[in-house]
Swiss-Prot record:
GO terms for molecular function: tRNA (guanine(37)-N1)-methyltransferase activity. Belongs to the RNA methyltransferase TrmD family. This is tRNA (guanine-N(1)-)-methyltransferase. The gene is trmD. It comes from Rickettsia akari (strain Hartford). It catalyses: guanosine(37) in tRNA + S-adenosyl-L-methionine = N(1)-methylguanosine(37) in tRNA + S-adenosyl-L-homocysteine + H(+).
Amino acid sequence: MSILHATILTVFPEMFPGTLGDSLAGQALKKNIWSYDVINIRDFGLTKHKNVDDEAYGGGDGLIMRPDVLGNAIEHALSLNPNASIYYPSPRGRVFTQSFTKEMLKNKNLIFLCGRYEGIDERVIEEYNVEEISVGDYILSGGEIPTLAILDCLIRLLPGVLMNQNTLSSESFEEDGEFKGGLECSLYTRPKIWRGRAVPSVLLSGNHKLINEWKKEQSRMITKLRRPELLKDL
């Protein structure tokens, strides 16, 4: 079985693997369940200063990452990771969701282009059939943090990463899971009473039918309150 391999293009290579070198993702990296390489875009920069950006045609604030620089960096990435799907974290992109992760994993070879400054030249997106992907309706300083978040989400779905793969079915947003794409129910552990707050008695009853019904109703109520657009099947 092929492993997940990510090639990351960035002007800040020291940001990787970052949090992906720890916890579940870090253990999976050591087990060779996934792998990565990082390409410094500045290695393909122009002049002795290794410039990677320039002023925007048509005016406007901010600098744009140059297509000639990015093109050379992407060509190098494709030589290391052939047939890879290329993703560009961008607020203009398709919103990243749990169901999207399964679509992305159909190709285990991925390239992430981490933009900086005002963004990248549109011709790069057209030339390499780059898919823009958004992690939410807010603006970050660059694509590195979204790339880390997306990879973390992908890695934990790989076989052998979680000790109990069945836990995936009881998580929020899992359309085929226990909560049918809704939000996870409230969670409790020991002690039974903490600062006057008791664990719901149904969870202590040992009646699995009642417990499952309670969990589903909790999920429905929480989803209705916080994310009503997810209620289609609840």
